[in-house]
UniProtKB/Swiss-Prot annotation:
One GO cellular component term: large ribosomal subunit
InterPro entries (UniProt xref): Ribosomal_bL32, Ribosomal_bL32_bact, Ribosomal_zn-bd
Keywords per UniProt: Ribonucleoprotein, Ribosomal protein
Keyword Ribosomal protein: yes
Keyword Ribonucleoprotein among record annotations: yes
Family: Belongs to the bacterial ribosomal protein bL32 family.
Provenance organism: Kosmotoga olearia (strain ATCC BAA-1733 / DSM 21960 / TBF 19.5.1)
Protein name: Large ribosomal subunit protein bL32
GO biological process, one term: translation
Amino acid sequence: MAVPKQKRSRSRTHHKRVKIYRPIKVAVSVCPNCGEPKEPHRVCLHCGYYGGKQILEIGE
């Protein structure tokens, strides 16, 4: 059975653990139709447009 040769230091353990629980950064672009922030390559949830065409009907 595999056994570690040396004990991992506390700082090394914490440094590795921080990367697991770090929040994921989400890319944001601006909708050319309404100017609201949206995710790239997705339909705008505020106006329903994607690529200059209306995909979703947003009721006001």
